[in-house]
Amino acid sequence: MDDRRRFHRLQTQMRAQYFLKEKKGGWEECTVIDVSRKGVGIKFHKPKNIPVGSVIHLEVFPPKELEPVVLNGVLKRIEQEGDDLIGGVELKEVLDGNKLARLG
């Protein structure tokens, strides 16, 4: 399959939480499973109806750091994988080297 991504993705497993702008409710737990300069892959642990196109706010908690990395983006794809949902988020900004290093 042809991989058309502009940026290389780094595999990871980082605790995170997300909030959907369009939905009423609080933060939900998730795991960031990969990261690139312009996107992240997320494993949603409590599957619910999350429509493609949703604006998503993320706080990612790198190991051994006190402050989370805050990211904002749009959900571009979502699919079922076992009991979880796996989503792809296109970030609103290209990550600088510092943020990418904290996440990778």
Regions found by a protein language model. Name each.
Residues 21-23, 37-38, 78-83:
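Short, conserved beta-turn/loop elements at beta-strand boundaries and strand-helix junctions
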Residues 1-35:
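N-terminal helix initiation/capping motif
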Residues 15-21, 53-69:
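Short conserved beta-strand and strand-loop elements enriched in small hydrophobics
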Residues 31-33, 41-43, 87-92:
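Short, acidic/hydrophobic/Gly-rich beta-strand patch recurrent on exposed beta strands
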Residues 28-31, 71-76:
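Short beta-strand-centered aromatic/proline hotspots
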Residues 34, 75-79, 93:
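A residue-level detector for short acidic-glycine micro-motifs
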Residues 23-25, 82-104:
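C-terminal output/interaction extensions
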